[in-house]
Amino acid sequence: MLMASTTSAVPGHPSLPSLPSNSSQERPLDTRDPLLARAELALLSIVFVAVALSNGLVLAALARRGRRGHWAPIHVFIGHLCLADLAVALFQVLPQLAWKATDRFRGPDALCRAVKYLQMVGMYASSYMILAMTLDRHRAICRPMLAYRHGSGAHWNRPVLVAWAFSLLLSLPQLFIFAQRNVEGGSGVTDCWACFAEPWGRRTYVTWIALMVFVAPTLGIAACQVLIFREIHASLVPGPSERPGGRRRGRRTGSPGEGAHVSAAVAKTVRMTLVIVVVYVLCWAPFFLVQLWAAWDPEAPLEGAPFVLLMLLASLNSCTNPWIYASFSSSVSSELRSLLCCARGRTPPSLGPQDESCTTASSSLAKDTSS
């Protein structure tokens, strides 16, 4: 799925990454467990519908808001995150679903390479768009003047472009690793398989993907969220000017009412930080753990149903992404309620300009954290 075909050189196993093409093991046709195959198809179908529907709804809500000219910088990132997750649904889950249904890849060599390339682009883009969004929040809150000079309100901005560019570039090895290859000796049966020049190539490549798609973005997201929390917490701590006998050198300003608003914003930021990091890790960790296990352990339980099904959960994070960010953006959640009310024939609630999201550099710290 990730860095190999859905078929394997392991006998009888239809879903694990393929071994180098010089493996002496071969899997004959029609050896799949029918119950497990149906479970795989059902799981992929559910994931595809969930990813496509959830991201489509959030994109529709953003489009409605954009027609009224109410796009804020955070909406740009949420929109591109939804596009990246839709790419996961269309170019990763859907081809995988068709592949599972036919057991072998049905298509020419160019299509095999293109599918494998686009599968990886979606995975990179989904992770890197979250990282870009987090970096933008860090810049807006911790370096507001820098964010104001550069601006971030366009539909395409620098972090978005960098995220897409890295996704496209880092996926290029897929074009050279995968190809339509004979998988059953001289029988003429072909499949979209990976081939590595050295025996250690597969382990190295799987580890590299795990680091670049999961470990590095996780560390970056966690670090930025910690810095954001520290910045907001520092704004609430009375400075020397607010202590008895102190001089006016503190950072905290504003009325008690504003301080209460910032306190509520801090609580919301803490919740958002925990949700983002925990959900990101929980969604990606099972998939990459079994991928690394399969790559590094020759005795890995490749035939077990839990192992097989976990191999299919690379797109799980794409199901949760739109709802996490929509729930923490009052403007997007209000627009979603309005969209659903219109679909049911109800009168939508009015949406005021105060629902704007949070990452403009000119916003107050409270607004930056309470989107």
UniProtKB/Swiss-Prot annotation:
Membrane topology: Multi-pass membrane protein
Entry keyword annotation includes Magnesium: no
Keywords: Cell membrane, Diabetes insipidus, Disease variant, G-protein coupled receptor, Glycoprotein, Lipoprotein, Membrane, Palmitate, Receptor, Transducer, Transmembrane, Transmembrane helix
Cytoplasmic face of the membrane: 64-77, 136-159, 221-271, 329-371
GO terms of molecular function: vasopressin receptor activity
Residues with attached carbohydrate: 22
Tissue: Kidney.
Region annotated Disordered, chain positions: 1-30, 240-259, 349-371
Subcellular location: Cell membrane
Stretches of the chain found on the membrane's Extracellular side: 1-38, 99-113, 181-200, 294-308
CDD domains xrefs: 7tmA_V2R (cd15388)
Annotated InterPro entries: GPCR_Rhodpsn, GPCR_Rhodpsn_7TM, Vasoprsn_rcpt, Vprsn_rcpt_V2
A single GO cellular-component term on record: membrane
Biological-process GO terms, alphabetical: activation of adenylate cyclase activity; adenylate cyclase-modulating G protein-coupled receptor signaling pathway; cellular response to hormone stimulus; G protein-coupled receptor signaling pathway; hemostasis; negative regulation of cell population proliferation; positive regulation of cell population proliferation; positive regulation of gene expression
Main localization, broad class: membrane
Chain ranges passing through the membrane: 39-63, 78-98, 114-135, 160-180, 201-220, 272-293, 309-328
Disease: Nephrogenic syndrome of inappropriate antidiuresis: Characterized by an inability to excrete a free water load, with inappropriately concentrated urine and resultant hyponatremia, hypoosmolarity, and natriuresis.
Quaternary organization: Interacts with ARRDC4. Identified in a complex containing at least ARRDC4, V2R and HGS. Interacts with TMEM147.
Physiological role: Receptor for arginine vasopressin. The activity of this receptor is mediated by G proteins which activate adenylate cyclase. Involved in renal water reabsorption.
Protein known as: Vasopressin V2 receptor
Higher taxonomy: Eukaryota, Metazoa, Chordata, Craniata, Vertebrata
